[in-house]
Every structure is written in C-alpha cells, then in structure tokens.
A protein has these predicted regions:
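Active-site acidic/histidine proton-transfer and metal-coordination neighborhood
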Residues: 21, 58-65, 76-164, 171, ...
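Short aromatic/hydrophobic contact patches that present stacked aromatics
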Residues: 8, 104, 217
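Active-site beta-loop-alpha junctions enriched in small/polar residues
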Residues: 10-14, 38-42, 71-74, 107-110, ...
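Short, charged helix-to-loop "capping" segments that act as catalytic/coupling loops
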Residues: 16, 127-129, 135, 172-176, ...
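N-terminal pre-domain/capping segments
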Residues: 1-100, 157-161, 187
Length: 236
C-alpha cells in the first residue's frame, strides 16, 4: 500500500446494497488499496451481524484497509438533531477503529462565511486530533473553492482543510487553472478525488442526482482529468 496516499475507492462508488466483505473484495479486485466507508455503511455492516473485530478481520483477510470516513453534515445548524450528533460521534469512532486521520464533511445549508467559519471551528474542536475535510459542492452552501477557502481560513483551525474533487470542480464552473487555488497553501488540501463528467450537466435543480449516480471514471468524460492532476502536482 502507498505509505502516504493510498488509492481509495469511495463508499458511494460501491453503492449501499452490498455486504461488507463483498465491498472489500470488489475494491481489492479492481486494484484499489483502500475503501471509503460512510457512517451508514458501517451501520449496515453491524446490521449484518458483524462486530468491529469481524470487520477488521475481513479487511486483514483481504489485505485491505478503510482509508476514508464520511460524512458529517448539518454541522452548522444552531440546533443539531440527535441523529446528526450521533452520526458525528460514530465517525469519530470509525476513525479510531480504522486508524483514519480525516473525516469528509459537507454543508448543504447556505450561511455567511463568518457564521459557517464559527460552526466549523466548533466542529474542529469536537474532532480533536482528526482532520475535518470540507468538500465544496456546486449545489451546496459551500459551492466552490473560493467560499471553501474563505470559511477554512476564517475558522483558523489546524485541523480544518479542503477536499478537491474533479466532478465538483467542473460542475462549479471553475477553470482547471492554478489561479483558482493560488492563495490556498498546499498543506490545506487534505484529499484529492478523481473522476470525470459528462459534457452536458444535469439541470441545476437535479444536479445532485448527477453527482450521486452519474459520474464517469477518470479520463472517460470531457477530458479534464489529466489537466486536473497536472494542476494538483504543480501546486505541490
């Protein structure tokens, strides 16, 4: 396995209808080094009758690891639901169990930079040693890298960082150009997600459906993957 940057298949890429061991086997056979796991998918594994020790044994059996944990949402709500509070704690537990350093997070609700930064600061304090990776998504309250960096910068937390995703990048109409991230230190980018997009996007009202169900493999869409990777490499 790559010591620092394991090649990981995201949890949603493998859907939510397969058993845990089938998920691990599929990722292994496809050449991935690790799997991402959503809190919901972890709960599904427990619902299969597996315990934490069984999950770890399956991973060890196939020489795989969980290398990504997600997904904390609604973290900027003034009054968070118990479901979201519990999901957040579950993500912390998963990081401890699988020795994962970061949690992917998104925010659908749209608030000011100042308010969002304050709520991100509170989340980072709760996360402690774990990195909070903020994922800009064009249909969300943090639609692009510009607002994403403004929020992370204003939060001023060592464990607040950003995620770059090819699909979200293109659908946010951001040019694949270093100028977009020129003010963002390279060490504030915690994860790079590589995929591809169709030339014509879904309608704005259903853009999230495309994000969830109709992405393309790297290099099979409009051809931005190589340029995106080159940009990331040049950034350092």
């Amino acid at each position: 396995m790559s010591k620092e940057f394991p090649i990981t298949i995201s949890s949603w890429t493998l859907g939510d209808q397969c058993k845990f061991e089938d998920r691990v086997i599929a990722a292994k056979n496809a050449g991935y080094e690790g799997i991402g796991l959503r809190a919901e998918t972890y709960v599904d594994s427990l619902n299969e009758g597996l315990f934490d020790k069984d999950i770890l044994a399956i991973l060890d059996k196939h020489g795989m690891k969980v290398t990504e944990v997600e997904y904390i949402a609604q973290w900027a709500e003034e009054h968070r639901s118990y479901e979201q509070k519990y999901k957040e704690q579950l993500c912390f537990h998963m990081c401890e169990l699988f020795d994962v350093k970061q949690i992917n997070c998104g925010l659908m609700e749209n608030y000011s930079v100042e308010y969002t930064a304050q709520k991100l600061r509170e989340l980072c304090q709760r996360a402690g040693k774990y990195i909070i990776g903020i994922e800009p998504m064009p249909y969300s309250g943090i639609p692009d890298m510009k607002k994403g960096w403004a929020v992370v910068k204003a939060a001023d937390c060592e464990n607040a960082k950003l995620i770059m995703d090819t699909w979200h990048w293109v659908r946010a109409n951001q040019p694949v150009d270093l100028s977009v991230i020129e003010d963002i230190p390279a060490d504030k980018i915690v994860s790079i997600q590589i995929n591809d997009v169709w030339e014509r996007p879904y309608a704005t009202t259903i853009l999230r459906d495309e994000s969830m169900h109709d992405r393309l493999a790297p290099g099979t869409g409009i051809g931005c993957t190589a340029a995106f990777v080159k940009m990331v490499k040049e950034k350092g």
